[in-house]
Amino acid sequence: MLMSWSPEECRDQGEPQGDRYSLCAKLVEKPDRGSEEHLEPGLGPIIIRSASGPTLAFWQAVLVGDVGSVSRILSDSSTGLAPDSIFDTSDPERWRDYRFNIRALRLWSLTYEEELTTPLHVAASRGHTEVLELLLRRRAKPDSAPGGRTALHEACSAGHAACVRVLLVAGADPNTLDQDGKRPLHLCRGPGILECVELLLKFGAQVDGRTEDEEETPLHIAARLGHVELADLLLRWGACPDVRNSEGWTPLLAACDIRCQSPKDAEATTNRCFQLCRLLLSVGADADAANQDKQRPLHLACRHGHSAVVQLLLSCGVNANAMDYGGHTPLHCALLGPTTAVAHSPEHTVRDLLNHGAVRVWPGALPKVLDRWCMSPRTIEVLMNTYRVVQLPEEAKGLVPPEILQKYHGFYSSLFALVRQPRSLQHLCRCALRSHLEGCLPHALPRLPLPPRMLRFLQLDFEDLLY
């Protein structure tokens, strides 16, 4: 049973027996706070919400980067302010509202969460280089982390390369972990990201340093961001292209998992993914590496509609029929991906897989494929051209919305006219030859002494109708 006593109610209970008393004692006990080791004896953090006078003026000067005012106030010993003064930017009133809300749910929170920072952190996060230099000259500790992050973490996450340089020269540790187990190298973002990363590496940051929980390296993060230049920089500094995180993901897997945010970004997203994958493969990344769920780069590239990446991976000889932990092949992933992937031309992905020996879709699933991908008639075309007959029920026409039927009238008229009807002799010859070459299709077809047009026909070239 969940106890919901407040500290006052606990004190009123007297001395209950057993576990209840122990729990009550723990509730009223002052909790340990990791930040207290950073505070001077007898002093607590300065609450910004209640600050006034020189303290408030000092805080505002740091925020705007007014180095003159910061210097003047620090020079006045009567203010009691120091370069390492700790400020609490949290809102106690907001906590009180939250506390009363959770009490209504029969829960109890003993203390509110402090949000601690120092002038050094604020200056670093806002790019105030002169204020930063002043504070460091006045003996501010570069690795102070009352809130769980150092000033170097803040400067890197904001992409302020000049501040990163100042802190590193002052002796900041480039490999220290923040409260989330991340190093400065993992947090680099913003316009100065490349310069920040290079500075960290020059000052001894571990190029393959891992995060504490996920065990991700900076190269994993560069791949997830789709940042080709950052990945290239890390690889030139010796980053391992096949390093795995705690779930078995390699940077190549992370790159193939890049998702398109909107149809307008489809081309740019696929291009970034392609450039990243080509870069990683060029330095020896395993094109067929699988994570803990047995997902391979080809599964992910197919699921997200990265057709150029699919071609690249297939050219490396990856298995077009490998199954993930759920029993899905790359072709399944391509057809199970979001229908918004139509902007990525899924028909090219499906055709490339089939031309590299992918096992065809079970005929009984074709109505579901038609229902899902009817807005991409070329995807339907390339699938249907791998069967000797159109294996659809007569009522399948009802699966296609009228507006799609009207838009692609020529193709869908030819499709439904062939339901339970014989296909052309030309098509049957294609099926027979492809079946005969099964297992060596991608290597054998290009070697056949055939005219280019006939070769394209055998490789399921798009014609926008069926016969």
UniProtKB/Swiss-Prot annotation:
Source domain of life: Eukaryota
Cellular-component GO terms for this entry: cytoplasm; nucleus
SOCS box domain mapped to chain residues: 412-467
SMART domains, per database record: ANK, SOCS, SOCS_box
Family annotation (Pfam families): Ank, Ank_2, SOCS_box
Alphabetized UniProt keyword annotations: ANK repeat, Cytoplasm, Nucleus, Repeat, Ubl conjugation pathway
Gene3D superfamilies reported for this sequence: Ankyrin repeat-containing domain, SOCS box
Pathway annotation from the record: Protein modification; protein ubiquitination
The ANK repeat ranges on this chain: 115-144, 147-176, 180-209, 214-243, 247-289, 293-322, 326-361
Subcellular location: Nucleus; Cytoplasm
Keyword Repeat: yes
A biological-process GO annotation: intracellular signal transduction
PROSITE patterns in alphabetical order: ANK_REP_REGION (PS50297), ANK_REPEAT (PS50088), SOCS (PS50225)
Role noted for this protein: May be a substrate-recognition component of a SCF-like ECS (Elongin-Cullin-SOCS-box protein) E3 ubiquitin-protein ligase complex which mediates the ubiquitination and subsequent proteasomal degradation of target proteins.
Record remark: domains: The SOCS box domain mediates the interaction with the Elongin BC complex, an adapter module in different E3 ubiquitin-protein ligase complexes.
Family listed: Belongs to the ankyrin SOCS box (ASB) family.
Protein name: Ankyrin repeat and SOCS box protein 10
Source species of the chain: Mus musculus
